C-alpha cells in the first residue's frame, strides 16, 4: 500500500512568486488527505495532476489566512468534477464559521455534502479501516493544532513453509491467512493466522506541525514518525522574533525530530524574509541537530515506505 506526501505550498505569511502558502497533501492507497489549504493550493494540485475529487478529508491547523485562503476555491471546484461523496473538514473553533460565511458570501454552488467538525485537541478526529488521525494542541497566537495520521499494525510476514507443514494448500487459503482469517487445512483442521505469520509489523506515521512555539509535548505526539512535516520559520539568530510571533526556529524543529526519533523531517512555513538561495541557513542549522532534515519546496514529492 503506497503512502506519499506532496508539498503543495511551503511558504508562511505571504505568497512569493516561487513559493505558495502552506499546504500538504497525503495520498494513501488512493485516498487523499489535505493538511491546510493556503493560497496557491489549487495551482499545485493542477500542476501535479492530483485529482482533488479524491480528497476525503481536510485538516486545518488554525484559521490564519495563510492556511485557509485556498479552501473556498477547492470546495467550489470540487463541484465541477462530479463529486458526490462528502468531504470532511476538521479544525479548531471558527473554521465552521469561515466555511459557512464563504459559501454564503461567494454564493458557492456545492453539489456534495460538506461536513465541518470543530475540534478540541487532543483527540482522535478521523478514523479509517486501518488508520486514525489525531489532533494535538500547539501554542500559537490563536488556537492551533497539529495532526498525526498513524496506521495500525500490519500482520506479520507470511511463512509459506509453515503453511505447507500445516497442510494448507497453496492458493486462496494462503491469502485468507495473511488477511487474518482462520482456514481449514486438507485434513479439516483449523489453522489460525498466528500459526503461519511472524511478529506483527508496525504501520507508518505521518505528522504535520506548523505555527507554534516549541513545546516538549509535541515530541511525544510525533514520536516515531516516518515523516514529520514541521515548520522551521526562522534561524536561531531570530529566536526572539520567533517567540514573539509564536513560531519555531529550524533548530527547534530539528530538536523535536531528534528527540522524537523520526525517520525523516522536511521543513515548511519559511519566513518570506528568506529567498530560496538563503534557505540553506535554516537547513544547516537544523542538520546540525538532526541530519535527516531537508528543505521542502513547492510540489515536492516524498515517498513514505514501510520499514519492513
Set out the residue ranges of the language-model regions.
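Binuclear metal-ion centers of metallo-dependent hydrolases, dominated by the metallo-beta-lactamase
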Residues: 122, 214-308
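Active-site neighborhood of divalent metal-dependent phosphoester bond hydrolases
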Residues: 83-118, 273
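Active-site metal-binding motif and surrounding structural segment of the metallo-beta-lactamase
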Residues: 39-90, 118-120
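Active-site-proximal loop/helix segment associated with metal-binding centers of metalloenzymes
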Residues: 16, 131-208, 212-221, 227-229
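Active-site neighborhood of phospho(di)ester-bond hydrolases with catalytic His/Asp-centered motifs
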Residues: 35-38, 55-63, 91-92, 207-212, ...
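General small-molecule cofactor/ligand-binding pocket signal
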Residues: 6, 90, 115-120, 134-136, ...
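Conserved beta-strand hairpin/beta-sheet module of binuclear metal-dependent hydrolase folds
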Residues: 1-48, 84-86, 147-149, 156, ...
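Metal-dependent catalytic neighborhoods of phosphoester/phosphodiester hydrolases
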Residues: 70-77, 102, 275-285
Amino acid at each position: 500500500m503506497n503512502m506519499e506526501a506532496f508539498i503543495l505550498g511551503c511558504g508562511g505569511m505571504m505568497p512569493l512568486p516561487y513559493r505558495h502558502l502552506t499546504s500538504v497533501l497525503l495520498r494513501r492507497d488512493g485516498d487523499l488527505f489535505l493538511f491546510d489549504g493556503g493560497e496557491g493550493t489549487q495551482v499545485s494540485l493542477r500542476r501535479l495532476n492530483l485529482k482533488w475529487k479524491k480528497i476525503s478529508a481536510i485538516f486545518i491547523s488554525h484559521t490564519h489566512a495563510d492556511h485557509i485562503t485556498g479552501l473556498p476555491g477547492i470546495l467550489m471546484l470540487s463541484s465541477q468534477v462530479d463529486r458526490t461523496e462528502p468531504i470532511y473538514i476538521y479544525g479548531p473553533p471558527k473554521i465552521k464559521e469561515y466555511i459557512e460565511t464563504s459559501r454564503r458570501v461567494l454564493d458557492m454552488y456545492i453539489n456534495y455534502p460538506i461536513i465541518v467538525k470543530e475540534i478540541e485537541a487532543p483527540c482522535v478526529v478521523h478514523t479509517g479501516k486501518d488508520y486514525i488521525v489525531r489532533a494535538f494542541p500547539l501554542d500559537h497566537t490563536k488556537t492551533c493544532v497539529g495532526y498525526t495520521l498513524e496506521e495500525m499494525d500490519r500482520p506479520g510476514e507470511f511463512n509459506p513453509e509453515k503453511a505447507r507443514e500445516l497442510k494448507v494448500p497453496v492458493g486462496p487459503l494462503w491469502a485468507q491467512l495473511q488477511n487474518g482469517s482462520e482456514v481449514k487445512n486438507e485434513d479439516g483442521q483449523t489453522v489460525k493466522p498466528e500459526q503461519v505469520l511472524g511478529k506483527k509489523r508496525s504501520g507508518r506515521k505521518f505528522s504535520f506541525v506548523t505555527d507554534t512555539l516549541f513545546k516538549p509535548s509535541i515530541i511525544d505526539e510525533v514520536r516515531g514518525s516516518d515523516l514529520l512535516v514541521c515548520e522551521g520559520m526562522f534561524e536561531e539568530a531570530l529566536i526572539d522574533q520567533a517567540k514573539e510571533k509564536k513560531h519555531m526556529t529550524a533548530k527547534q524543529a530539528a530538536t523535536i525530530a531528534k528527540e522524537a526519533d523520526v525517520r525523516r523531517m522536511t521543513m515548511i512555513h519559511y519566513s518570506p524574509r528568506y529567498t530560496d538561495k538563503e534557505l540553506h541557513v535554516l537547513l544547516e542549522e537544523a542538520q546540525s541537530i538532526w541530519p535527516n532534515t531537508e528543505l521542502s519546496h513547492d510540489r515536492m514529492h516524498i515517498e513514505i515506505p514501510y520499514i519492513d
